[in-house]
Regions:
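Phosphate-binding/catalytic loops
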Residues: 115-171
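Conserved active-site and cofactor/substrate-binding residues in soluble primary-metabolism enzymes
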Residues: 36, 40, 61, 111-114, ...
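Nucleotide and nucleotide-moiety/phosphate-recognizing core
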Residues: 15-25, 33, 40-97
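Secondary-structure boundary/capping motif
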Residues: 33-34, 142
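A generic local secondary-structure boundary/capping motif
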Residues: 11-14, 67, 119-121
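Helix-loop-strand module that forms the ligand-binding subsite of alpha/beta enzymes
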Residues: 78, 82-129
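SAM-dependent methyltransferases
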Residues: 1-21, 166-171
Length: 171
């Protein structure tokens, strides 16, 4: 019986990169209600509306485990929740360059995200990052659904992410 050695011929970069230069990444904890907006955004996304050669990833609360995915793309668009004191479902686009540029943490995944940015900067592998935040008013432990108001913001977030992708592609 012959061994299939092909499965062992991939490098880490090959495994985490599909050759696309833009990654759309949703992060959050879907077990915490509205805090899971980024994950819910990715899970409900109609990728057919987007140009070809875009990567999409449900990053969950991945933190450090997302480094190989992020470093293998030139531009990363992140969707996440924030409790920044703004009116609920305010959608904000940030372009953080340093970990201190990220909004206040909500849960453990943001701690990992900020540290991940520091690590990528240190390794000189920091892509251009765009961060869409959706303001939420509360987190509900062990609640799998988004509140109606936050769920209703997903089409607008999708439209804003699509517009940004098209602007990036046209430049």
């Amino acid at each position: 019986m012959e061994k299939n050695t092909e499965i062992f011929q991939y490098t880490t970069d090959d495994f985490h990169s599909d050759g696309n230069d833009i990654l759309v990444l949703g992060i959050g904890n879907y077990l915490m209600g509205d805090e899971g907006i980024g994950v819910q955004f990715i899970q409900n996304l109609d990728t057919a509306k987007f140009p070809q050669n875009i990567s999409f990833l449900d990053g969950g609360t991945g933190g450090f485990t997302l480094i190989p995915y992020i470093e293998s793309h030139q531009k990363v668009i992140i969707v996440d929740a924030t409790m920044d004191g703004k009116e609920e479902v305010t959608i904000t686009l940030l372009k953080p360059k340093f970990s201190d540029d990220f909004p206040i943490s909500l849960s453990g995944h943001n701690f990992g995200l900020k540290d991940m940015v520091d690590i990528l900067s240190f390794m000189n592998k920091m892509p251009e990052i765009y961060l869409f935040t959706v303001t939420i008013s509360k987190m509900e432990p062990m609640y799998l659904e988004l509140s109606p108001k936050v769920a209703a913001s997903i089409p607008k977030v999708t439209e804003m992410v699509l517009d940004l992708v098209q602007k990036i592609r046209n430049n």
